[in-house]
């Protein structure tokens, strides 16, 4: 796997020996009906360890230092739905909704942000008989934030063809990952004196 990153977006990274421990508390509720599953969870984190950016305006060089972030609250709702469309076609839908809230000092200012986002994954399995199978999967993630950085929508599709050999003792699989190169992580950081964009392209295409 490889990734392409704009070099200027990497900046300089520094450690911090004065970091305090980070503490998280989690509560999760699950409800299951037959093969369907619904999950609700809440996570509260104090002192989350993050990388705080700063910029030299003369050179536009960015530096990142590890610091403790005040408070983060994270809510999630997850739904998993398996279906049997036909005798040879099964489908699974996984949908997740999230709400995250940040509250802390960040880059010298009081930083408060609450936002919603979601993701979904669709998995299809086809059984053609005589040991032949095909899987067609895809996912999508809506725009979201990480601290002051905003990530755009991204997604991907995967295709796999399988053939069972020697009375199911082994399997030959051919896989094509992200053929349309939709899985690109595009983000912008516009906060304080920083205005930058970044693009990361994981190269998952293989066969």
Language-model segments: residues:
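C-terminal beta-signal and adjacent terminal beta-strands/loops
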Residues: 165-207
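Outer membrane beta-barrel strand-and-loop segments of large Gram-negative receptors
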Residues: 14, 20, 26, 37-94, ...
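Outer-membrane beta-barrel translocator domains and adjoining extracellular loop/strand segments
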Residues: 1-5, 9-13, 48-57, 102-111, ...
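Transmembrane beta-strands of outer-membrane beta-barrel pores
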Residues: 3-4, 33-35, 42-48, 97-103, ...
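Residues on the lipid-exposed face of transmembrane beta-strands in outer-membrane beta-barrel proteins
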Residues: 19, 27-33, 77-83, 120-126, ...
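C-terminal beta-barrel architecture of Gram-negative outer-membrane proteins
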Residues: 97-102, 117-165, 177, 188-191
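Repeated loop/turn-to-beta-strand initiation elements of outer-membrane beta-barrel proteins
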Residues: 35-40, 87-93, 130-136, 167-172, ...
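Structural signature of Gram-negative outer-membrane beta-barrels, strongest in the C-terminal barrel
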Residues: 1-46, 130-133, 142, 150, ...
């Amino acid at each position: 796997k490889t990734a392409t990153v704009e070099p200027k977006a990497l900046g300089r990274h520094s450690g911090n020996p004065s970091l305090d421990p980070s503490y998280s508390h989690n509560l999760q509720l699950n409800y299951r009906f037959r093969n369907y599953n619904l999950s609700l969870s809440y996570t509260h984190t104090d002192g989350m360890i993050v990388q705080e950016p700063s910029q030299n305006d003369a050179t536009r060089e960015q530096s990142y230092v590890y610091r403790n972030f005040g408070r983060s609250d994270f809510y999630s709702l997850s739904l998993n739905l398996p279906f049997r469309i036909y005798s040879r076609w099964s489908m699974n839908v996984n949908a997740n909704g999230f709400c995250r809230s940040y509250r802390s000092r960040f880059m010298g200012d009081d930083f408060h942000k609450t936002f919603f986002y979601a993701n979904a994954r669709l998995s299809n399995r086809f059984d053609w008989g005589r040991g032949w199978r095909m899987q067609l999967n895809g996912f999508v993630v809506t725009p979201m934030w990480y601290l002051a950085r905003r990530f755009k929508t991204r997604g991907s599709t995967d295709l796999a063809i399988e053939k069972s050999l020697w009375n199911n003792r082994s399997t030959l699989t051919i896989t094509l990952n992200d053929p349309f190169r939709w899985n690109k992580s595009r983000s912008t950081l516009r906060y304080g004196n920083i205005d930058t964009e970044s693009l990361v392209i994981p190269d998952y295409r293989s066969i």
